[in-house]
Amino acid sequence: MKEYYQENHRKYYDQTFSIDPTSFLLPLARCLHPGSTILDVGCGSGRDMRWLKDQGFQPEGFERSQGLAGLARAHSGCPVLEGDFEVHDFSGMKMDAILLVGALVHVPHEHFKKVFENILRALKPGGYVLLTLKEGIQDTGISGGRIFYQWLDEYLRKAIDHLNLSVVDFSRQVSKIRKTDVWLGYVLKKQEGLL
């Protein structure tokens, strides 16, 4: 699965870059001040970084696929760090916001807490997270050996309940690529004075 995005980076870019991200990025953007730093984890094609940069923010990307990282740099004009977010040490970063748009859909439920907590180390106290995950009760396999782990709202809220995050905004949106998919969107705020 990890190789899918490297081997298919151009196809993935072509499929996702032209989608207008306004509907799912605007709830986060409204919480931030101009110039806020944003880490886009699993930045993919760079589409969301480009939109955020155009709104006056300072996005940086983090991407596992070397091919996607190169395309994201070229088309967003933003720096992109290459690495595996499941093991990367994020504790040296202090960002105003973190973007996780579909980035955690391939993380099994039993690993979600550990991976999410690791990424949250990059967030300043009082910072925001945009988290989107597919809604559903079954895990669905798609071409290339990718497995998409789906969530119900109530279970996801329980999974993040202990993380000192409050839900600022919640949405359900039909996928712009596959009309049978619904994405759960959460803008979360990290409590002040907490790690």
Language-model segments: what does each one mean?
Residues 1-90, 107-114, 118, 128-195:
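Class I (Rossmann-like) S-adenosyl-L-methionine-dependent methyltransferase catalytic domain
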